[in-house]
């Protein structure tokens, strides 16, 4: 296997040699969406992330694209309306990453919510979604609920409401935003840390950057600096705290120990009434999430920092198991049934609400005298619309600072993500090579008048995601193999390989139209077609693809966020960690010391996910 040109080396050279309109700090959902929105408008964009892309909050979510049914009880109608609009948009622009899932929300005698209140809430939810697909909700009686999910508590059940929201791969959703940004000239680099302090040089801000991979320092020149560091916004900005960060913990158990027969179930904790989800993901089930205030180590008032350890504690595991066992009495889950845990911080806005549940999921955008534009709050589902607002504000600031040149109105409302934007012909799925090559030549267009963002694109036809829509883009993608209207070289048909049904489903749902590149690896080297875990559909080829095309730089990047054995395998991917480290060493030219370091870091991360057992 011969490595392609190293994307990171190309990107690093661009960071040092070019001048940018925006430097986005933070490679999670918010930062990735901002980079994509700005780049597709014609701005020159750089993004730096101190760890891996989506390595913090954005890969520790419940992995849902949803309107937030429970937010209705707090009167957050605008947030639910916006979230449902974005959910429906993702169903069209990223159908492989926004997969409809039936949810059952049972009602019980003497418990909140009552059947009538639940029916009203779900009906309002449908109305705020404008009664658009996937499907409308319906009421089920207790007998039908028992037939659909036999293990669900039947005592006192008064029926249930069935509604539909969507599941996603949160880390991959972030990744595809970055990949798309790269096709229109953005440059994004992981393991690059930016310091809050900077200096001015004419119309540019000069930021100090540390390459945590290479160990050296350099400067990046940009007209505007954007702080998109999520829950670390307060510690990065150094200003008055604006966030009320909370910790959310999830458990992963075997699907046979907590079977929901393919449906997600909404449950309430018997201890405090908090709403949680029981979510089937392949042959596993996710239980979550908790919500506890951030306990700054030694200083409860201190904002969290990226180096802080965010993990599950025994109290979290006990709480989630208690909730699951109350909702599913036959399960009788024990701590030994927990395959793994994952935990993350939510960047909730501090609006002075009395409870964590009522804390705002909305976002805030503000600038300061030092030259930074800050964004905080929000949720995974609304990452695109939040980014649109940020870029609108950024353009206003750039105008105030005398920036001239071509900027288009927002392009992301109907623009497919990479896995959805190619033609599917004769069972052949095509994809993209690594991004972040030389930026494309922009097509000039007049800057819209101040205070406007230009006309919104018309909503696409429901099948638009299968059309070669990228060919209509004013900017040709950078570093794309071949023409978008013709099959990519070596693209391989799903039907030409003898793959198990679960593997076929996994590959198409994960990579969408990019799956041809993964299949090409299997076709070229048979050993890459083997399963990495007997219970799971992951292939060895995906390890190679993660390193070459999906921007992975460390063993943990590969096995936690690209091929998530760390979350779903009983061995946590430790049995293929050595193989992954060897691949990285070969592809990236590592020394033995560097290879061992990456392997050690991954083993430590796996160990941290099980530290609750020693509490």
For the regions a language model picked out, list residue spans one by one.
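Extreme N-terminal leader/targeting segments of oxidoreductases
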Residues: 1-22, 37-41
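C-terminal accessory subdomains/tails of enzymes that are appended
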Residues: 10, 19, 51, 97, ...
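Core beta-strand elements of the Rossmann-like FAD/NAD(P) dinucleotide-binding domain
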Residues: 18-20, 214-224
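Glycine-rich Rossmann-fold phosphate-binding loop(s) that bind the pyrophosphate
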Residues: 27-28, 50
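Glycine-rich FAD pyrophosphate-binding loop
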Residues: 39-59
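Dinucleotide-binding Rossmann-like beta1-alpha1 core, especially the glycine-rich loop
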Residues: 63-148, 276
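A conserved short coil-to-beta-strand element within the FAD-binding core of flavoproteins
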Residues: 190-205
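Flavin (primarily FAD) binding-site architecture
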Residues: 227-240
